[in-house]
Amino acid sequence: MSHAVARRQEFAADNLAARKVGAEPLIEGLKRIHGAAPAFDSYWRSEVLPLLNSGFRPPIAEGFNRFSRADEIARVIDKQVAHELAVGKADPYDTHPSLRERIAALEGFDRRGETRDEAPAVSLLTGVEVLEVDLLRTMSAEAGNLKPIQWQDVATAVYLPLWTQAAEWYADAFQGITLEHLPEAITQENGIASRLRPKEGEKLDADRRKAKAIFVTGAALSVLLDRHGWRTSVQPGEPVLLEHDSSIVDPFDVVGALAKGTMTAEAWRTLCATAGISALELRPASAASSPALE
């Protein structure tokens, strides 16, 4: 009974909002909420938490705006909204009506003359950074000690150090491998995966070993290209990209594609030749003997 009452209250609130600001802005806002809400968990886990765990505090609201506008994420959000509009139905235990039901209840409003303001809702707030710090303090008392960081700086300050650490830990797995021979090294039985020595307490079955090999090889490739003057870009919702002149490489995607066979060795070698990186050695030059082998 209480859930049914809550749903009626939501309909009443929607009716009031439509009379105050117009049905069209309300409908568009509801669509954005229903599309973006499922995406926020992915944004938080994949984009925000790695920075918080490294001691940095990015602009969270700004980052989610970027994340939700990224091409692939925007397609997923649009698909989610389309699904809700097509088959969405409230469960008896839901406190809110479905998106389809809420929009249907607004169809009777006259939308002529309504104006649309495309500014995000966060623009109505002042002191967003302070509010974000307060939010983080509800999760950890140490939130005030986090260093502010802008999204354009996360590659250099956070990810490259993490990738360097991973590449150097498993450096011996890359011994003698140049980039032109990466296709064989990532696919052959005696390649990179077989050379990985687990850390203390780490268990690597065949699948985990393969996944680990793809990740650490992508990390090593990222570090290598960055140290040879490539520009590294890590933005919310976007793939990792390294760029130099007209060449663009998504290191983790490329290594995964080579491992799965969806990118041919010939295509990779052509890319390497064009970029002049064929002879570069994958093993980090700064690495001593791998700690995993000591």
Predicted regions and their residues:
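Cytosolic-facing loops and C-terminal tails of multi-pass membrane proteins
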Residues: M1-A6, F11, N15, R19, ...
